[in-house]
Amino acid sequence: MKPPPPIEELLPHRYGMLLVERVVDWDPASATVSATPSTQGWYAEAGGMPSRIGIELMAQAIAAHVSIVAWSKGEPPKKGVLLGARAYRATQPYFAAGGELIVKATRAFSDDSGMGAYDATIAHQGAQVAKARILVFEPPDFEAFIASQKQ
């Protein structure tokens, strides 16, 4: 497989909201990305990133996976939403600033309606520091879906 484009071409997130830095690896069922917490981030507390932000790191890994799969087929990525996280567990309250985190999201299931789930993990120096099942939804018509949520 050829290397994917830079993360900025895969995700719409910008400024301080783009928390992942690059795609480390990917295949049709999963993506692995890296992130490095900063003491300058909007989220910074106690010299690092609160581990609750790990859910967003996992969501960005999933978004990268969806975008890479579409990119590999020459298609634009579908827009989707994070529905929730099940059984999010972190082994520490903060991820240390400057320490590279490896975030892997593996598709557990998806269906034709756009519902899906990913099993996601975060590792630091080879040790798992967080895990969860992330529930996602890719509506067939994203704009109509968003409009329906405003009513």
How should each PLM-predicted stretch be described?
Residues M1-I7, L101-V103:
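Short Pro/Gly-enriched beta-strand edge/turn motifs at strand-loop
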Residues H13-L19, A96-L101:
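Short coil-to-beta-strand transition motifs
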Residues R14-P50:
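Catalytic strand-loop segment that frames the active site of acyl-thioester-processing enzymes
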Residues V20-E21, L83-A85, A117, V129-K131:
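Hydrophobic residues on conserved beta-strands that form the core of alpha/beta folds
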Residues E21-V24, T91, T106-A108, L135:
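Conserved positions in beta-strands of structured domains
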Residues A46-H65, K79-L82:
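Compact, glycine-rich, soluble single-domain proteins
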Residues H65-K104:
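Hydrophobic beta-strand-centered segment that forms part of the acyl-chain substrate-binding groove
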Residues A96-I102, T106-Q151:
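HotDog/MaoC-like acyl-thioester-processing domains
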